[in-house]
């Protein structure tokens, strides 16, 4: 017999991947801000055990923790556990990103627009992946961020082109001090040949912790992000910064480049080639906070 579910309890399944945790924790935190909840983080079950639970076995699972109003997760390894948890203890099963299982199995699927989700009652389209960043009221016009990614499935790389773009950005406004950081994908030789410049501090990813970037985004009035690092583009937008896109070669027109092109057309970001050198990047007029928008929809739909 299922225990009575409470909207005050959220189970968050984590596969341990930073990008997935950023999304699921972002939604859980947003729910907590709107309506205080207890967030319980759980490891996903092995697939065989999750399937057994779905078929009515594993009756002792999760009996020692409060029943959830919501179970949520991001990443393929969490999908069966979401369904098993709902089967065993109740609650609404919410999956972030397009699942590998049929969409109809979940109460709600939060899927980025660039994944072209179908129009269904249990599908909410998001602008990019959700994240933990909060809109900031402490942005400083004299602080800028340069966020460097690396080669990916959709983009190749060109150090020299990036060096030229970075030099132009630094030279354009002597009132801004820039902080540059890298990612796990950044080629090792990128920093080796990056020219030193006044008003530029370089902090490699190896010298940062999980809270470093959110702290920087809370203060930076401008952020330039390489096109491959689309998740950081959305994080910078959520913080409220004026966002520019550093251009790297695309392997082909793809869903990521199409998503960035759409953001530029809507005035949220500026590509380097479209940036007038004598002007500062403009901040978007609206608020970009997809985690809160989705959390508000969930509460109004099920827990109002």
Which residue ranges define each predicted feature?
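Leloir-type glycosyltransferase catalytic cores
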Residues: 181, 260-304
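Catalytic donor nucleotide-activated moiety binding site of glycosyltransferases and closely related
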Residues: 175-209
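Conserved donor-binding/catalytic loop of nucleotide-activated donor transferases
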Residues: 218-220, 238-242
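Extreme N-terminal starter segment of soluble prokaryotic enzymes
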Residues: 5-11
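Active-site and donor-binding regions of nucleotide-sugar-utilizing enzymes
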Residues: 12-125, 131
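A nucleotide-sugar donor-handling region in carbohydrate enzymes
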Residues: 103-159, 272, 276-281, 288
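Donor nucleotide-activated moiety binding/catalytic core segment of transferases
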Residues: 195-231
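Active-site donor-nucleotide binding/catalytic segment of nucleotide-sugar enzymes
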Residues: 11-13, 129-188
């Amino acid at each position: 017999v299922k225990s009575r579910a409470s909207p005050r309890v959220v189970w968050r399944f984590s596969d341990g991947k930073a990008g997935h945790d950023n999304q699921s924790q972002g939604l859980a935190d947003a729910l907590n801000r709107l309506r205080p909840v207890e967030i319980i983080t759980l490891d996903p079950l092995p697939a065989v055990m999750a399937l057994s639970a779905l078929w009515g076995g594993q009756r002792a699972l999760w009996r020692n923790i409060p029943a959830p109003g919501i179970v949520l997760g991001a990443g393929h390894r969490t999908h069966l556990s979401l369904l098993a948890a709902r089967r065993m203890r109740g609650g609404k099963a919410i999956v972030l990103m397009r699942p590998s299982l049929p969409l109809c199995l979940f109460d709600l699927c939060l899927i980025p627009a660039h994944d072209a989700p179908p129009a269904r009652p249990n599908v909410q389209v998001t602008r990019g992946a959700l994240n933990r960043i909060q809109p900031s009221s402490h942005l400083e016009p004299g602080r800028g961020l340069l966020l460097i990614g690396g080669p990916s499935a959709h983009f190749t790389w060109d150090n020299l082109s990036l060096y030229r773009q970075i030099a132009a950005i630094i030279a354009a406004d002597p009132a801004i001090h820039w902080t540059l950081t890298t990612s796990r994908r950044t080629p090792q030789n990128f920093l080796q040949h990056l020219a030193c410049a006044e008003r530029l501090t370089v902090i490699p990813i190896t010298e940062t912790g999980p809270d470093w970037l959110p702290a920087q985004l809370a203060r930076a009035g401008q952020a330039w992000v390489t096109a491959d690092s689309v998740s950081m583009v959305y994080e910078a937008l959520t913080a409220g910064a004026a966002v520019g896109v550093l251009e790297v070669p695309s392997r082909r027109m793809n869903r990521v480049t199409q998503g960035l092109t759409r953001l530029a057309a809507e005035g949220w970001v500026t590509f380097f080639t479209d940036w007038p050198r004598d002007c500062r990047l403009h901040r978007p007029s609206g608020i970009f906070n997809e985690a809160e928008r989705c959390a508000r929809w969930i509460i109004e739909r099920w827990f109002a």
